């Protein structure tokens, strides 16, 4: 039986691995505290929580696959009750997510009913070089299938994406695996099909409750799998009083004075992502203005 100590060693970790004789590479990630921290300050409907979990896992896997310095934003916009779902992650596996809901969303509501008429936008912003943006139609039943199609079309490589969200020992968890044929052309469709068939047998409790090494052994015990050192994953918002103050100064002095008068001399700027409050009185705002000049 797997003990708590066994499985928690790989909570909030991302691993890369390579099949030595198959020319196929893989990634595995599990979000525990990272996912909980994302949800803690919001009362999202269950269907929205699950969608954000899928998008977060996919973003982690995408940043690891592309191997670049910078950040990636995965964003859904629509005209349904879910107006926006957004995830941003970087090459350090720091990730944040938020959603905007305007309407009733039931627990088992489908992706298309939540979003209505919408699109999936992936923005890749390297620290150096040109920014890239891809717009993907939401023509598949799940976001995982839409993203898998994106991987295949954008990189022209056979790719399998498995993402699950749920609970393990009473706590939210999101986890996933990516398999991709090597870009050097040495992999065969037969090798890829063999490995993806095995991966498709993975159970939720295995993804959520096993260390990476044990999970890979269960799935691929007849294969030689090289497992590389893990990378930590964490929730990181990046908000600050300075950024909130800069946003506040985008509105006119007249509007600022009206808000100050309405709210007893203090403006509360709350971060939409992590829920942190930043308070600005007249003196603080004048100081911001002086430093901006």
Curated annotation (Swiss-Prot):
Keywords: Chaperone, Cytoplasm, Disulfide bond, Redox-active center, Zinc
GO molecular function, one term: unfolded protein binding
InterPro entries xref list: Heat_shock_Hsp33 (IPR000397), Heat_shock_Hsp33_C (IPR016154), Heat_shock_Hsp33_N (IPR016153), Hsp33_helix_hairpin_bin_dom_sf (IPR023212)
Disulfide bonds: 237-239, 271-274
Pfam families: HSP33 (PF01430)
One cellular-component annotation, GO: cytoplasm
Predominant subcellular localization, coarse grouping: cytoplasm
Keyword Phosphoprotein recorded: no
Entry comment on modification after translation: Under oxidizing conditions two disulfide bonds are formed involving the reactive cysteines. Under reducing conditions zinc is bound to the reactive cysteines and the protein is inactive.
GO biological process, one term: protein refolding
Protein location: Cytoplasm
Family: Belongs to the HSP33 family.
Function of the molecule: Redox regulated molecular chaperone. Protects both thermally unfolding and oxidatively damaged proteins from irreversible aggregation. Plays an important role in the bacterial defense system toward oxidative stress.
Name of this chain's protein: 33 kDa chaperonin
Organism: Haemophilus influenzae (strain PittEE)
Organism placement in taxonomy: Bacteria, Pseudomonadati, Pseudomonadota, Gammaproteobacteria, Pasteurellales
């Amino acid at each position: 039986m797997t003990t708590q100590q066994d499985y928690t060693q790989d909570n909030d970790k991302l691993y890369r691995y390579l099949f030595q004789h198959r020319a196929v590479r893989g990634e595995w990630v599990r979000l525990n505290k990272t996912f909980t921290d994302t949800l803690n300050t919001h009362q999202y409907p269950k269907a929205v929580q699950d969608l954000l979990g899928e998008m977060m896992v996919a973003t982690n896997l995408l940043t690891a696959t592309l191997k670049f310095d910078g950040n990636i934003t995965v964003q859904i916009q629509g005209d349904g009750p879910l107006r926006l779902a957004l995830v941003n992650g970087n090459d350090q596996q720091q990730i944040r997510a938020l959603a905007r809901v305007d309407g009733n969303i039931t627990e088992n509501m489908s992706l298309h009913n939540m979003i209505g008429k919408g699109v999936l936008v992936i923005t890749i912003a390297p620290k150096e070089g040109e920014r890239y943006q891809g717009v993907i139609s939401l023509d598949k039943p799940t976001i995982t299938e839409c993203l898998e199609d994106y991987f295949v079309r954008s990189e022209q490589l056979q790719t399998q994406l498995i993402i699950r969200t749920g609970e393990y020992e009473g706590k939210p968890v999101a986890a996933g695996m990516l398999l991709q044929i090597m870009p050097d052309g040495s992999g065969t469709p037969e090798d890829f099909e063999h490995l993806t068939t095995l991966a498709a047998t993975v159970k939720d409790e295995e993804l959520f409750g096993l260390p990476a090494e044990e999970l890979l052994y269960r799935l691929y015990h007849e294969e030689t799998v090289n497992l590389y050192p893990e990378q930590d994953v964490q929730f990181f918002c990046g908000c600050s009083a300075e950024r909130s103050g800069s946003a506040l100064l985008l509105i006119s002095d007249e509007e600022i004075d009206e808000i100050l008068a309405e709210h007893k001399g203090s403006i509360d700027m709350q971060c939409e992502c992590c829920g942190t409050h930043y308070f600005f009185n007249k003196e603080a705002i004048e100081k911001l203005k002086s430093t901006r000049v």
